[in-house]
Design a protein with these regions (language model features):
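Membrane-spanning alpha-helical segments of multipass transporters and channels
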Residues: 1-175
Length: 175
């Protein structure tokens, strides 16, 4: 990261300073998507305010997770994010009930944030059932906390390895 003109920036300040752009873009995207769902597609939603909140928290969690993985693990982190995304789309109970999916997805789907976001959105659209909505948001916040740990703590030990991997990748002239 370029740090000219900055007086002794701490790693956390650099992390959040760079993440701010991704945060703003993800929040704008979430607001545009929910507005389009509600007013263009006319999705019947019992709790539109909660839908905006859920989309905002989901965008925050996913953008932070992607940013942390890419920053901490470099190209390997980017590849991991793609694998996680594909596995979540295939096995998150968003397209079919989880009980109808292959057994591997039934075992791993709760270890990804996507099912919690989907369940929270369902609560917003169909109606709230007890504290289930709050539980789903709490799980999303746990994934955001894990992403922060990856981005702020795990990154430092991998900096040398990432630099080595990038040099070797440049030597291959594949990218």
């Amino acid at each position: 990261a370029r740090t000219e003109g900055l007086v002794n920036p701490r790693p956390a300040e650099l992390f959040f300073g760079r993440y701010l752009l991704f945060f703003v873009l993800s929040q704008l995207q979430a607001a545009i998507i929910v507005t389009g769902d509600l007013y263009l597609l006319k999705v019947q939603c019992l709790h539109p305010g909660a839908m905006y909140l859920t989309a905002s928290l989901t965008a925050f969690t996913f953008s932070l997770l992607i940013y942390s993985m890419a920053l901490s693990f470099g190209d390997v982190g980017k590849a991991l994010v793609v694998v996680i995304m594909v596995m979540q789309i295939a096995g998150s109970s968003g397209t079919f009930p989880i009980e109808l999916l292959p057994e591997i997805y039934q075992k791993i789907y709760r270890f990804f944030p996507f099912p919690y976001a989907i369940d929270a959105m369902r609560e917003c659209i169909c109606g709230m059932y007890g504290s289930y909505y709050g539980q789903q948001l709490a799980f999303l916040l746990l994934f955001a906390a894990a992403a922060l740990l990856i981005g702020l703590l795990v990154r430092r030990p991998f900096m040398g390895l990432n630099h080595f991997m990038e040099e070797k990748l440049e030597e291959t002239e594949l990218l």
